[in-house]
Each structure stands twice: as C-alpha cells, then as structure tokens.
Amino acid sequence: MRLVREARPHGREKLRSNLMEWFHWLLREAEIYDVRYPVKGAYVWRPYGMKIRRNVEALIRRLHDETGHEEVLFPVFIPYEFFGKESEHIRGFEKEVFWVSKGGEGGERLVLRPTSETAIMPMVKLWVQDYKDLPLRLYQIVSVFRAETKMTHPMIRLREISMFKEAHTVHVDREDAERQVREAVEIYKRIFDEMCLAYMINRRPDWDKFAGAVYTIAFDTVLPDGRALQIGTVHYLGTKFTEVFEVTYLAPDGSRRLAHTTSYGISERSIAAMLITHGDDAGTVIPPKLAPIQVVVVPIFYGEEEKGVVMPAAEQAAKALREAGFRVHVDGRDDKTPGWKFYYWELRGVPLRVEVGKRDVEGRQVVVARRDTLAKYAVAVDELVDAVKALLSEVEANLRRRAVEELRGRIVRVETVEAARAAIREGKVVELPWSGDNDCGLKLQELVGADALGVPMDSEASVGGFDLRDPACGKRAEVWLRLAERY
C-alpha cells in the first residue's frame, strides 16, 4: 500500500456557521430523513437513513442481549389510572403528554406513552412472585410521544421519538439495582464508542433528574456549535414505582419485600450526534462498523471499450471484499461522471472508496481513498482485502480520536461567574465550584446563563482540599458543577 495523495480533509466552515441549516441540508441531500411531513416534530426516515438506523439498533440489541436483557413489546396506550399513580412522574410529564380523549363512541381515557415505567410495572407485578424471578431485565425499541412546545429539530427534539430504546430492570435490593446502573453505564459507553462519539458522563442535579428517579446519570456530547446534547440517560428509581404498583417478591426468609427498579434510554439523538460530530462541508462520515456501505467501488471508464475492461475488474474487487465480510457497493452507472460519484458517496459518508480505471487494471492495482482524510493509496489487487481492513480500522480510530480531542478542548474549569460567562460565549462547557445546595445551583444557572449538566462522573468531581467558594451563594464548595448551553 503506497500513499499517492496526502491527507486534505474537507473544511467545516458551513457546518460551524449554521449547524441546523447544515444538518437539514445533510439529511435532505444524503436522503436520510425527510422533514416535510405536515405534523410538527414528526419526520420520515428514508431508505438510506433506515439502513443506518437498523445498524445502530442492531448494535444496541446485541449489547443488551449479551448482558442478559430480553426484548419485549408493550402497547403504545397507557391507561390513565396507571399513568396517574406516581405523582412525581405525572408532574414531570403531564405537560408533555398526548391524551387520547375520544375513541369511536367513547371509551376510557388513555395516554400515548411518553415513557413506559407506568405501563411495565403493572405487568411486572403479575410476573414477579419471589426472589428467584429476579433480576428481571427487559428492553424495547419503540415510538414514544412528547408534546414538545419548544422549537423542534430533526432527530434532536421530536414529538414522536421513533427509535426509543428503553430498558427496565427489577431487583431484590438497592445494591443489586445500583450494580445494574453501573452495567448500564458500561453498555452505553460501548455503544457510543462504536459510534465514535465523545461524551461526558454527568450525574444530573436533583432539579433536572428524571421524573420519579432517585438520581439520573446522563451522557452528554457537545456539537460543533458549542451546545450540549443529551444522548443517553440511566436512572435509579428505587422503590418509587414498585410502591405505587405494589411490586413485591417473596424473600428467602418468607417476608414480602418491595423490588427496586432502574430504567435507561437512548434514541435517534445518538444518530444525529454521530452524523453531526463526523460531519464536514461535503457531508458526513459514518463509522465503519455502522455504515450501510463500508466500501464503494467506482469504475472509471470512458466509452464502451474501457467499460468492458474496467467493469469486470471492479466487480472482481467487490467480490473479493464481500467474501471477506465487507459491505460493498459497485457504482456502475454510466450516466454519471466519476467526479459526481465521488461527491455523492462522500456526502453519504461511505468510509472508503475504491477507484478502478484502465491504467489500474493494467497495473493490477486499485486506488483507495479515505473519506475522513481524503488521503489516497495505491493498493495491489491481491493486497486489497488486507488494506481495506487496515484502513477501516484507521478511519474508526481517527474519527474517535478527533471527537475526543474536540470535546476535551471544550471543557474548562473556572472559579468565577464572569469567567464562566465568557467561556460559554466561546462555546465551552464550564466547571464551576458548587456547594451542592440546590438553590445555589439554580442561581448559578441563572447567573451564568447556561444549563447545569451535573456533577462529573468521568473525572474528579470533588474540589479536593482547595478552599473554593460557590460563586452563587458564597458557601464552601464541595464539587464541580458542569454548565453549558444545550439543546
């Protein structure tokens, strides 16, 4: 494998200048998603987008199945008598709920699920009898509905979240449930690592935790415009839902005890984050393990005579790659120029392009181009499979490295409100000393003009032995609080 063109990646000026305009352009031109459906916050997945989505769903399913989770499918309707049982939960969701107020000639009042804790617990009560039935680990990938009143964004802020993976687990005690919380965090790290995403792990402040949770752990990434995007959450629910739904089990000593539960969710926001994080002014780069097409073969010919020489060689290269397990497409269209095809597949984020021209056939080689760097390599035909394997690994590693470096460069630690405001204006995530007092934290948000993401769980959270003061209320600081503008 010989380098024949140095790396010269596309710029990101258009992407950075107006991120949402760029994202709409990408979804439209790459035929991933159509935003023209005439219901606010409800959009259409196009065939290429569905291929990306199915690969992400397969990753999610694999990692849940491998860790003892079992897939289920619950109805979209939740009876109001179930939904209204947990008071904190209904207070948190009531303004976002779609109500089914009429069905045919009447009928009971129903809720379109915003999340499924109140749908699943009544059934768990029927399934769990004694401690031998626990732990119970369930998940489903479904649509959930939120009556968003804010501005909606494709994949990011929706009224129908159509790829909502929600896991619900039931345990004998807090210790076992919190062990599950830690495992859920590890599952999400593996998912986001395969998506080549950089992320922060934050314990949400009490005023921003999931409605009905004892505590919430969130995964946040930062988009190129400096705004944070929540891409996953894990909740320890304690006995809040099992108390109201009377989910108990028979313990070994013969007593009946309340079960403890957790839930954790991820949605198409993660796909939005992936497309944007790896995007540039020519389109996006889809991480190799998730790309519908990992290698596109572009035959380069002029006239029927060259076509007769080049096409068989292109098909032979594709055959060898498919037999090695790669997802390959040959773009043999003769009504499009090679340059047009290069643009088309770069827009769609295919990680590698194999170019086959007449001279390449004569020299028993091909040219392989990386989408992430645009570097090109001359590769002997009999070395193509090994070269593609190595280059796909390099593309994946480079995407992950770039994302991590960019996120690290955005997180700054400051001690004053003025410094925090200045950093937020520059698109940074700030860490400020915090006393842990909720009133002080809410005031910090107001003073800085940003949202609290929470206390870091991926780095040292304690202020240690430093005599730092909470800038909102003057109390002695105990931990660092992350703040950022966010979607």
Curated annotation (Swiss-Prot):
Reactions it catalyzes: tRNA(Pro) + L-proline + ATP = L-prolyl-tRNA(Pro) + AMP + diphosphate
InterPro entries found in the cross-reference section: aa-tRNA-synt_IIb (IPR002314), aa-tRNA-synth_II (IPR006195), aa-tRNA-synth_II/BPL/LPL (IPR045864), Anticodon-bd (IPR004154), Anticodon-bd_dom_sf (IPR036621), Pro-tRNA-ligase_IIa (IPR002316), Pro-tRNA-ligase_IIa_arc-type (IPR004499), Pro-tRNA_ligase_II_C (IPR016061)
Principal place of residence: cytoplasm
One MF term in the entry's GO annotations: ATP binding
Major enzyme class: ligase
Lineage: superkingdom: Archaea
GO BP, one annotated term: prolyl-tRNA aminoacylation
One family name in Pfam for this protein: tRNA-synt_2b
GO cellular component, one term: cytoplasm
Alphabetized UniProt keyword annotations: Aminoacyl-tRNA synthetase, ATP-binding, Cytoplasm, Ligase, Nucleotide-binding, Protein biosynthesis
Description of its domains: Consists of three domains: the N-terminal catalytic domain, the anticodon-binding domain and the C-terminal extension.
HAMAP family in UniProt: Pro_tRNA_synth_type3
Function: Catalyzes the attachment of proline to tRNA(Pro) in a two-step reaction: proline is first activated by ATP to form Pro-AMP and then transferred to the acceptor end of tRNA(Pro).
The protein's name: Proline--tRNA ligase
Lineage summary: Archaea, Thermoproteota, Thermoprotei, Thermoproteales, Thermoproteaceae
